C-alpha cells in the first residue's frame, strides 16, 4: 500500500532524481485537500452502518429471491455475512479515499473477491448493485446533502457548509474506488 508521499518517493527514486516539479505540486495539492479528505472519510464512517444496511435492503428490494429459502441472504447467518462483506468493502473504499491511493483496496479487498464470491455462489450482479447504492450514498454524504427526510434522526452531516465545487474531486475519487469494486465483480 502506497500513500501519495510514498508514491512520490518511489517515483523519484526510480528516476534517480529528487522529488520536484509535478510530484511536488501533487503533494502540495494532496496536503491542501487534507481536511476535506478527512471530512469526507468521516462522513462515510459516521454513516457506514446506515449506508450498508440501506444498500443491502435496496439490493434485496430489487431481487426478493435473495431472502427466499435457498437465497443468498437466507437464513440470518447469510444475511449477516452479506452485511459484513458490504461493511468491509465500504471500509476499504474509505481507506483508499483517506490514502488517496487504491492499492489498499486492490490488495486487501478486491484481490480474489470475484473468484471467492463465484465459488460461494454469491450473485455478483446483486453485490455490484449494493456497491452502486453505497457509491451514490457516499457521494451524497461527501457533498453533505443526503436526504434528511429519508434518513431521519440517524443522519449525521459533516456539520460545515460545503461548496460543491470543492468536493467534486473527492466525490469523483470516491466514485472511482466504488467503480473499481464494481469492475472487480463484473
From Swiss-Prot:
It comes from the Bacteria. (2R,3E)-phycoerythrobilin 2 binds at residue 82. InterPro entries: Globin-like_sf, Phycobilisome_asu/bsu, Phycobilisome_asu/bsu_sf. One of its GO terms (cellular component) is plasma membrane-derived thylakoid membrane. (2R,3E)-phycoerythrobilin 3 binds at residue 167. The modification N4-methylasparagine is found at residue 72. Keywords: Antenna complex, Bile pigment, Chromophore, Electron transport, Membrane, Methylation, Photosynthesis, Phycobilisome, Thylakoid, Transport. (2R,3E)-phycoerythrobilin 1 binds at residues 50, 61. SUPFAM superfamilies: Globin-like. It is found in: Cellular thylakoid membrane. It is a peripheral membrane protein. Pfam families: Phycobilisome. Contains three covalently linked bilin chromophores. One of its GO terms (biological process) is photosynthesis. Belongs to the phycobiliprotein family. Heterodimer of an alpha and a beta chain. Light-harvesting photosynthetic bile pigment-protein from the phycobiliprotein complex. This is C-phycoerythrin beta chain.
Amino acid at each position: 500500500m502506497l500513500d501519495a508521499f510514498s508514491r512520490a518517493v518511489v517515483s523519484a527514486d526510480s528516476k534517480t532524481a529528487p522529488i520536484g516539479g509535478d510530484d511536488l505540486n501533487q503533494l502540495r495539492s494532496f496536503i491542501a485537500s487534507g481536511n476535506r479528505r478527512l471530512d469526507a472519510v468521516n462522513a462515510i464512517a459516521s454513516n457506514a452502518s446506515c449506508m450498508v444496511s440501506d444498500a443491502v435492503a435496496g439490493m434485496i428490494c430489487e431481487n426478493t429471491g435473495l431472502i427466499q429459502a435457498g437465497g443468498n441472504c437466507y437464513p440470518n447467518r447469510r444475511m449477516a455475512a452479506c452485511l459484513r462483506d458490504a461493511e468491509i468493502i465500504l471500509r476499504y473504499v474509505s481507506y483508499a479515499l483517506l490514502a488517496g491511493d487504491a492499492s489498499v483496496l486492490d490488495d486487501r479487498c478486491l484481490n480474489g473477491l470475484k473468484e471467492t464470491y463465484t465459488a460461494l455462489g454469491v450473485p455478483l450482479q446483486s453485490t455490484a448493485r449494493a456497491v452502486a447504492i453505497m457509491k451514490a450514498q457516499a457521494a451524497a454524504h461527501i457533498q453533505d446533502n443526503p436526504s434528511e427526510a429519508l434518513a431521519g434522526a440517524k443522519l449525521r452531516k459533516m456539520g460545515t457548509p460545503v461548496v460543491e465545487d470543492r468536493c467534486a474531486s473527492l466525490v469523483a475519487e470516491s466514485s472511482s474506488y466504488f467503480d473499481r469494486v464494481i469492475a472487480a465483480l463484473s
